[in-house]
């Protein structure tokens, strides 16, 4: 890729240096980015399981595992894994009828990813959600929750405690609940990406 980019710059088809491209949000979070073999295998395993469960459900089969935890050390590519999985689900015909959301408790990441959806077929800004956004919509078939270890409870809400309690009330949950409880209440299946 580096050689190709250098050639494109020499021919004046590309303006920016490769380093600038590699540091751009579109490059960092693109589902077209080459995945590691482990990431690819994880996506394929999850996708095949979802496909089978979806097919079984169409024929009256019961729903299976509601919660799946995908864990890894910080910086191992869980965010790109979740984005790539969402992109695949939204763009493959077998599962494209499912209502899927990408949840992040980090406002800056939510804003960045919402901007990027304009460049990614099948994705819309409303697909990228905060934990409270999830509670304001109809039920989801699947929620992919990035940075799930950052989801909060009433003790971590500070000045947002009233909104937190209002959300719990709206969902019929006790005030001692947490944002993970919100996620479970609002979807059939959750994938929690944890450090």
Regions inferred by a protein language model and the residue ranges of each:
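The feature marks helicase ATPase cores and/or their adjacent C-terminal helical subdomains
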Residues: 1-195
């Amino acid at each position: 890729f580096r050689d190709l980019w250098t050639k494109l710059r020499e021919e004046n088809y590309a303006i920016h240096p490769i380093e600038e491209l590699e540091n751009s949000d579109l490059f960092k979070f693109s589902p077209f980015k080459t995945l590691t073999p482990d990431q690819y295998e994880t996506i394929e395993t999850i996708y095949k399981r979802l496909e089978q469960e979806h097919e079984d459900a169409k024929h009256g089969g019961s729903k299976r595992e509601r919660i799946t935890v995908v864990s890894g050390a910080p910086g191992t590519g869980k965010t790109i894994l979740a984005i790539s999985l969402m992109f695949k689900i939204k763009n493959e015909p077998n599962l494209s009828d499912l209502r899927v959301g990408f949840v992040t408790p980090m406002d800056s990441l939510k804003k960045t990813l919402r901007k990027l959806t304009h460049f990614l077929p099948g994705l819309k800004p409303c697909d990228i959600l905060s934990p409270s956004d999830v509670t304001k919509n109809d039920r989801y078939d699947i929620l992919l929750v990035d940075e799930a270890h950052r989801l909060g409870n009433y003790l971590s809400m500070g000045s947002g405690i009233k909104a937190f309690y209002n959300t719990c009330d709206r969902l019929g949950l006790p005030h001692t609940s947490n944002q993970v409880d919100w996620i479970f209440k609002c979807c059939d299946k959750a994938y929690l990406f944890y450090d």
